[in-house]
Amino acid sequence: MQIQVDTREHKKEWERIRTQFDDIGVKYFRSKMYVGDYQSLDNPRLVIDRKKDLQELCGNVCQQHERFKAELVRAIQQDIKIVILVEHGEDIKTLEDVYFWQNPRKHEIRWKTVNGRKVKTVCSEKAVDGMQLYKSL
């Protein structure tokens, strides 16, 4: 099996994944991909779009919606199936777990000074939580 890896994959993440590929003997090469981050040359109509965690997926679905949607449309037009792989961690094992996920950006409290008084503010009141993300999937 040989894997094509998108050259735009984050350097730090690529180094971690490259080490894993090397450890288990997976052959790979890097080049710019039309959609996604990884694909097997055995099945070029199936690609993997890797997300570091649910916060990255929220950013794609909400803040970068048009770019993310355009990538999905390009895949559909070329009859490419995309698997979105979210490497969130041990607390998310199933799609249903996403529903109960608490976005730390939505609940992070910061103090700022307004007119000489300290005021408590939420880091990002518009941040998407698990229930909203689940419903959009």
Language-model-detected regions and their locations in the chain:
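Acidic-basic catalytic patches of nuclease active cores, encompassing PD-(D/E)XK
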Residues: M1-N43
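Extended, alpha-helix-rich binding/interface surfaces that flank or overlap catalytic cores
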Residues: W14, K32-L137
